[in-house]
Amino acid sequence: MRALLRAVICAGCAAGAVVAAQSGQDGPHWAYGYMKPPAPGESGPPCPPAARPFPDCAYPVTPTADDGIKRTLPGTTRSFTRNEAYFDYGPADWYPEDHPAMPDIVARGRQADGVRACALCHYPNGQGKMENGGVAGLPAAYIQQQLADFKSGARRSADPRKANTNEMAAIARKLTDAEATAAADYFASMPWRKWVRVVESDSAPRVRATSNGLFLPVAGAPAEPIGQRIIEMPERPESTEMMRDPRSGFVAYVPIGSIAKGEALVTTGGDGRTVRCTTCHGADLNGTATIPGIAGRSASYIVRQLYDMQQGTRQTKTMKAAVAKLTVEDMVNITAYVASRPVESPLDTRPR
């Protein structure tokens, strides 16, 4: 009987651990690209002020052997090997017609100082991926302020393992004023284009995380309960992970009912639980000349920022009251609604 009781207790503990992981009650580690919460004392690589952004502030990984195969993507005549596509100081530009001429700091970075090209992570078109930030269409002054906050330590990650946040801080310290201005003006000049498809579901594909925090589906694995999480992954995993496809976006699986719950919080404030997002970000959440748009952007990124602001690792006076009372479930709901909204950019002149 005692053995049976111990087995029942252990099974209950295991089930509780799964529920805790899926509820995000230890913090939304899934939004940071991790499969479980950080262990006590666990952190990313040391990144002191004098460090070179790369490789000192990045996780050490075994270089991928280049198979020499030239690959291509739909709608372009260009071809690159995987390592050419990922070259830190001149990554592949698949669609140069999609953006203005890139400043040198965006296209190539500064190799002597370990400053990788902005286009490596954020793409030449500024759309970025779930593990970093989409920067296209943000106000130039806002981008400049974020670089200043990274530099001063006012913007850090609430998950201490997130190495690319530390690398951004190191890059910000290395940038000249002219480089920071050029990068900000460049990304601000391009429209943000809707990048994520939001799907309400009670389950999500099982995923694995890359060293940089990109979620990829586990081939052949059954779906798993979504709990109170958002699981975001590339629409075309191989194109994104292998070739950095800047035209292929993401799909975000969110809990059933979360979009409607999020709409109530975003548009009314939820009876004092938060502040109406539309007050500052605009009725359509597409921002203003000075305030960033949040509609249709990466779900993982939005959750990270809400949680970072609440935990005080991203310091911002304007958002302090808005995030103070939010639970992780609230953040999931808000994000589900915000990420699902249409994008209307005054810079986007494409026919509709």
Residue ranges and their predicted role:
Residues 269, 276, 284-290, 298, ...:
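Intrinsically disordered, low-complexity segments enriched in Gly and acidic/Ser/Thr residues
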Residues 1-5:
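N-terminal secretory signal peptides that target proteins for export/translocation
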Residues 6-17:
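Bacterial N-terminal signal peptides
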Residues 136-165, 196-198, 295-316:
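Extended intrinsically disordered, low-complexity coil regions enriched in Ser, Thr, Gly, Ala
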Residues 115, 124-130, 286, 315-316:
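Extracellular-facing binding/remodeling surfaces
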Residues 22-116, 155-276, 311-352:
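Flexible coil segments in periplasmic/lumen-exposed cytochrome c-class electron-transfer proteins
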Residues 129-135, 289-295:
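Short cysteine/histidine-rich zinc-coordinating motifs and their immediately flanking basic loops
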Residues 120-127, 151-152, 188-192, 235, ...:
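Detector for the c-type heme attachment site
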